[in-house]
Regions:
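HTH-adjacent hinge/linker in prokaryotic transcriptional regulators
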Residues: 2-60, 71, 93-96
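Conserved phosphate- and dinucleotide-binding cores of soluble alpha/beta proteins
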Residues: 5-6, 12, 83-188
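Electropositive phosphate-/nucleotide-binding environments in soluble metabolic enzymes
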Residues: 7, 34-41, 45, 62, ...
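Short conserved AdoMet
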Residues: 52, 73, 159-162
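Amphipathic alpha-helical effector-binding/dimerization core
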Residues: 56, 61-88, 92-94, 98-99
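Alpha-helical segments flanking ligand/cofactor-binding loops in enzyme cores
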Residues: 45-48, 66, 70, 121, ...
C-alpha cells in the first residue's frame, strides 16, 4: 500500500487504498516486477524454449521480459532494459553468457526502459531472429500500451525480428489501454 501511495497511483484510506483516476496508469517497474512473479518466471521459461543458443534476440523491456535473463544462456541480445543486463551480469560474472547490446536512449524511471529517438536510431542497423515483448494489455485485436512512444518501440523491435513472441500474464488480458501497438496479424 505504501509503495502505491508513494508512487502517486493510489491514496491510502482507512482499511486500504483507493486507486487514483488515471486514464492509463504507468506503474513503476520496481512494483510491476514483483506482481505475479511466479507466473512471469514460468512464462519466460516457456518462451526460452523457442530461442536457440545461436539466435539473435531483440527484447523490449518489461517486467515479464526481464525474467528472460534468468534463462537465456547464449546468443546475442539487443535490449532497451538495463535491468536485463544486471541479471545477466549476476548470472555470468566472468562474461561467458550471451553477448548483450544495450540500445541507446533516455532512461525512463517509471518503465525501467531506455526510450526515445536514440533508441530508434540505435536499432536501424539490426535485425534479429527472435523478438520478444510484453505490453500493457492484449485484447482480441492485438497489443495495447500506455503511450505512443511505447507502442512505437514495441512495433519497431518486433518488426525487425523474424519470429515474434509476446509474453503476457493473466492480468494483461482484456485490459483497456490507451494506444494500439500491433494487431495480431502482424505478430507471427
Amino acid at each position: 500500500f505504501n509503495e502505491l501511495a508513494a508512487s502517486g497511483l493510489a491514496l491510502r484510506t482507512h482499511g486500504g487504498i483507493r486507486f487514483l483516476e488515471q486514464e492509463v496508469p504507468s506503474v513503476p517497474y520496481g512494483l510491476r516486477e514483483e506482481w505475479n512473479i511466479e507466473e512471469k518466471k514460468a512464462i519466460a521459461q516457456e518462451a526460452v524454449k523457442y530461442i536457440r543458443d545461436s539466435h539473435s534476440v531483440m527484447i523490449y523491456g518489461g517486467s515479464t521480459t526481464g525474467h528472460l535473463g534468468f534463462y537465456l544462456t547464449q546468443g546475442r541480445i539487443i535490449t532497451n532494459l538495463p535491468d536485463l543486463c544486471r541479471i545477466l551480469r549476476m548470472r555470468f560474472p566472468t562474461g561467458d553468457g550471451p553477448q548483450v547490446i544495450l540500445t541507446g536512449g533516455e532512461f525512463d524511471f517509471r518503465t525501467g526502459n531506455l526510450e526515445g529517438p536514440a533508441l530508434r536510431r540505435s536499432l536501424e542497423n539490426y535485425e534479429c531472429d527472435v523478438g520478444v515483448a510484453s505490453a500493457y494489455g492484449v485484447d482480441e485485436t492485438g497489443l495495447i500500451d500506455i503511450s505512443d512512444e511505447c507502442s512505437e518501440q514495441i512495433a519497431l523491435m518486433l518488426g525487425k525480428s523474424s519470429l515474434r513472441i509476446i509474453l503476457a500474464d493473466h492480468s494483461k488480458f482484456k485490459r483497456k489501454g490507451f494506444c494500439r501497438s500491433l494487431p495480431w496479424n502482424r505478430i507471427h
